[in-house]
Amino acid sequence: VTSYGVALGLKDETATKTGINVTGTADLAPLDKQAAMVKEWVPDAKKVGILYCSAEKNSKYQATVVGAKLKEMGLEVKEYTAADSNEIASVTKLACQNSDVLYVPTDNTMASSAKTIDNIAQPAGVPIIAGEEGICSGCGVATLSISYYDIGYKAGEMAYDILAVSYTHLRAHETR
């Protein structure tokens, strides 16, 4: 789950320390900035389709947050969900027919089907703002993403600290 606070049921989802024996890194991208990119890259857009896999809780979380930000900007937002990869083509086609621009959050199912999405969105002339680099390189026009390399490196440092007898309940959660 992208938001560890949601996964752990923490009251303060923005806290950097869990207070329990859990630590690590998170790959949550800057969602407010990604939402702003929609307006920046497609300034005439009025309708935004958010395309994601309904089976991925992290994607639903991102869709909710980005959707709220886009609505605050005065854009009409509609979510288009696929339960699995078999539904992506039909859902993408529907989303493209009803949207000026698509937002695809960090989503494993969508990432593995980026070519399918691109084969539908590009001929339809519907640009895609992506939640991460992999989706962007497959079907997007822009992203503002995190670095999986940096996250992995930081996780390695944290693992070293744990193995060197640090106390995980004192260690802050970090995002890069």
Tell me what each language-model feature is.
Residues 1, 48-51, 99-110, 129-131:
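Periplasmic-binding protein-like
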Residues 1-7, 24-25, 128-132:
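Short beta-strand elements of ligand-binding domains
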Residues 7-45, 146-165:
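Hydrophobic alpha-helical segments within soluble ligand-binding/sensing domains
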Residues 44, 48-53, 58-61, 65:
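Conserved anion/nucleotide-ligand pocket segment
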Residues 70-84:
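Short beta-strand elements in bilobed, periplasmic/extracellular small-molecule ligand-binding domains
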Residues 81-96:
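Structural motif
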Residues 138-139:
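Small-residue-rich helix-loop
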Residues 168-175:
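Conserved small/polar residues in nucleotide/adenosyl-binding loops
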